[in-house]
Structure formats: C-alpha cells, structure tokens
C-alpha cells in the first residue's frame, strides 16, 4: 500500500515541498533563512493576533491600550515585546536571505526573485504601519513624514496623501485604516510566500557553487528538516535573549511619549531596519529626487538578473566580485548608522558618499568586475 502522505491530495503537496523534495547536497546555512522567515511570519501572526484582542485603534485610547497590554494582560508584556523584536529578527533574516541571493546568484530564478522583491516591499509596508499603531511620538511623526513623501509625486501627490490620511493630517482615520491594513497584510505575505515557494520548486534550489546539482540530490527530510530545526532554535534563542534582557534596545525612547501633533521630536527616524533607505532619502536635497532614490534603493534588486555579466552564476569562485560584495555590505551598514544620526556635518557628506557608493557598486562596479573576471579566465 502506498503511504498516505503520497496519495492524500493535501498531504501530497506538503510531502512534495518538505519531505520528498530533492535538494542539493551542499547547501550551506545561508539557505536556512527561508524557513526562518516562515517561522518569523507565523510568530508575528500569532503574537499579533493576541495583541489585536486587547488593542484599540483609536487615537484617544491606542497608547493606553498598549500600556494596558504590558501592565494588566497576562503575559501581555512578553507578547508585545516578542512582536516588536520579532519584526527586527524578521528583517535580519530578510537581509541575510537577500544577501545570500545576491552572493550566490539566486536571482537567476527570475520569477522567484521578483516575487521575493514584492515580498520585501510588502513586509516593509507592514512593518511601517505596525510602528504607527502604538501612537507614540515617533509613531505619529514617522507616519506624518513618510506618508508626506508621496506629496512629491507631481500633480496627484497632495490628493494622494490626503486620501491615505483620510483627512488633512495624520489622525483617527489614519490610525484605524493602518490597523486594518497591518492586520490583513501578513496574510497577503503568507500567500505570496507560497507563490514564492511554488516558483522555487519549479527549478529546485540553487547551491553555493552555482552549478547544477541534478547529479547529486538528497531528500529534504531528514537532512534539511533537522538543519531547519537547529536554525529555528537559534533564532528563537536570539529573539528570547533580546526580549527578556533588553526588549527596548532596538526601540526609540520617544515612542514612550504619547503622540502630540503640537510637539515635534528633535530627531525623527524610523526603526533601525529602514535607516539605510532613510539615509539615501535624506542624502538628496530635493524631495522628489529623494523619494525616487528611496524607492530605487530597493527596486534596484529587480535589475540584478540584467546586471549579471559574469559567465559564472555564483561569486564563490570570483574574488574581485566577493570584495565588492563585502564593500556593499559595509556601505549598507554605514548608511544604517548615518540614518540614525542628526542632519549635520560630517554626517551629511558621509551619507551622500555612501549613497553614491551604493548605486555605483550595484550599477557599475560589480558588472565591470564580472567582465574583468571573465577576461582573466579567458572566457
């Protein structure tokens, strides 16, 4: 008799995705982040659900409802901090996952890659709206500043911003709709993630060498299930250390002050995972130019398959490209640091140089380096 997991219509899908899936024998721990992102998403949906049971999306009570969750709800504090820091872990995994894709040439699977870029945008939108919900000072002013950027769009900008706000400023209508969107988006992300996997399983996984692994496959279970469980345990360990020892490490103290439209905080800045993009936005002294650079800083990922000039897929055997990749990582860390600094000398010029370097590396230096490597190998 055939095993039920191979015949049952539902279990057959799960079996082909997580049990009998042929996987390359040499994929490293950099391939763990996909499953970790799935775990992060499930964790965020569950903690978010319990938070939504006690949260009120109203300007008069939002801030105090979050305080109520932390003080009066059984284990409310741990649910709240797991949700807030879970977002940070989510973005750490996202950046690692995208970085892995860039390094090993995973963007050659164009459908998978493009869905991934859409997933990145959707996750960033969700995190932004979630940051507005506690209705602290940074929530309010962050929402005001970021939504205001849309007013830079010619002709329709102002109308668009007022339409998103549901009025002439960030107010009750804005908070209510942001809560509604913040609740629905993770489910859209989950659906997109399934499409992401669907496209991935059409081709199979890439591997560190970038060479076809069809000649050497192993079953996903038990080899990669156990590897994913180890990754998950390490992720949860890191998250719980953050939650239990320094839950406010990555937060902004200004968000413990209730939102006040009459008092602007001295330094308006987003959560740490948006700082690199915020630094690029600020480095251009023109509103529309800044907004375009901000969008392009992430949209540039879609161009990666077109910018790939090397005859090899992976960077594993390309030392010049490796150097440029790690310079890009250092550049992004520099931008993240600059995004959290006030707009004054020398931070302005450092931010501008780092922004130029970011686009220069991706659009010019890396494709040129790949061509040089081809010539060195006489290809």
UniProtKB/Swiss-Prot annotation:
GO cellular component: mitochondrial inner membrane; respiratory chain complex III
Keyword Phosphoprotein among record annotations: no
Pfam families with a match to the protein in the record: Cytochrom_B_C (PF00032), Cytochrome_B (PF00033)
Superkingdom, taxonomy of origin: Eukaryota
Binding-site residues for heme b b566, renumbered to this chain: 97, 196
UniProt keyword annotation of Secreted present: no
Function: Component of the ubiquinol-cytochrome c reductase complex (complex III or cytochrome b-c1 complex) that is part of the mitochondrial respiratory chain. The b-c1 complex mediates electron transfer from ubiquinol to cytochrome c. Contributes to the generation of a proton gradient across the mitochondrial membrane that is then used for ATP synthesis.
Family, as annotated: Belongs to the cytochrome b family.
Name the UniProt record assigns to this protein: Cytochrome b
Originating organism: Philantomba maxwellii
């Amino acid at each position: 008799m055939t095993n039920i997991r191979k015949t049952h219509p539902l279990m057959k899908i799960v079996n082909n995705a997580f049990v009998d899936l042929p996987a390359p024998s040499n994929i490293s721990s950099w391939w763990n982040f996909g499953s970790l992102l799935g775990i992060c998403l499930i964790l965020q949906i569950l903690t978010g659900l319990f938070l939504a049971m006690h949260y009120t999306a109203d300007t008069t009570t939002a801030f105090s409802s979050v305080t109520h969750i932390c003080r009066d709800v059984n284990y409310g504090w741990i649910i709240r901090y797991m949700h807030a820091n879970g977002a940070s872990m989510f973005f750490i995994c996202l950046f690692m996952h995208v970085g892995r894709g860039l390094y090993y040439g995973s963007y050659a699977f164009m459908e998978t890659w493009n869905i991934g870029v859409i997933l990145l945008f959707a996750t960033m939108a969700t995190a932004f709206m979630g940051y507005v919900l506690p209705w602290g000072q940074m929530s309010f002013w962050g929402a005001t500043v970021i939504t205001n950027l849309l007013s830079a769009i010619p002709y329709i900008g102002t109308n668009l911003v007022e339409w998103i706000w549901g009025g002439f400023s960030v107010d009750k209508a804005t908070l209510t709709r942001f809560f509604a969107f913040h609740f629905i988006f993770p489910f859209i992300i989950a659906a997109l993630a399934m499409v992401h996997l669907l496209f991935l399983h059409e081709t199979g996984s890439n591997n560190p060498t970038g060479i076809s692994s069809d000649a050497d496959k192993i079953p996903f279970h038990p080899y990669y299930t156990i590897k994913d469980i180890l990754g998950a345990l390490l992720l949860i360990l890191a998250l719980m250390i953050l939650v239990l020892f320094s839950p406010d490490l990555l937060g902004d103290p200004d968000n413990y002050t209730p939102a006040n439209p009459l008092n602007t905080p001295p330094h308006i800045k987003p959560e740490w995972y948006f700082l690199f993009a915020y630094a690029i936005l600020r480095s251009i002294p023109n509103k529309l130019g800044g907004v375009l650079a901000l969008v392009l800083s992430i949209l540039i990922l879609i161009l990666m398959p077109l910018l790939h000039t090397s005859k090899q897929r992976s960077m594993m055997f390309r030392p010049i490209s490796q150097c440029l990749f790690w310079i890009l990582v250092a550049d992004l860390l520099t931008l993240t640091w600059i995004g959290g600094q006030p707009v004054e000398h020398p931070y302005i010029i450092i931010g501008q140089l780092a922004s130029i370097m970011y686009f220069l590396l991706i659009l010019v230096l890396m494709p040129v380096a790949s061509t040089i490597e081809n010539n060195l190998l006489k290809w």
